[in-house]
């Protein structure tokens, strides 16, 4: 009889651990600011005036590799800013990214250099900066049009100002 009780206790412990693991993984991949990256207000100065976006800042290689992968939602005025140490030809893709995105490539003088609207979720097609850029702002698809963003518009963020 005690053998049955100990097996039942082990089974209950196993189930509890699996539920805890599942909830932890869900929170990690789907929670707001799931990555734990710091947030910053990004000011986009358009012909219609300034617009503010709250963005997670991806500075390190692992943060940039993770990006918005596995996220199921992104707010209308939220995004992720990828900041690189020097201007370069930047390539992105949508592998494991479930949210359609607009990608705003930003030059070293903090101006929008190139825009790609409506990047297809889960696509492995390469998305290029179309020339040298120093950062990329990923936004929920439709945000570029809604805010009236255009090449040449200015982008202000303390993360951009701190890059050498």
What does each model-found stretch correspond to?
Residues 2, 22-164:
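Compact, glycine-rich, soluble single-domain proteins
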Residues 2-14:
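Membrane-entry signal-anchor segments at the cytosolic-membrane interface
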Residues 11-24:
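Hydrophobic membrane-insertion alpha-helices, especially the h-region
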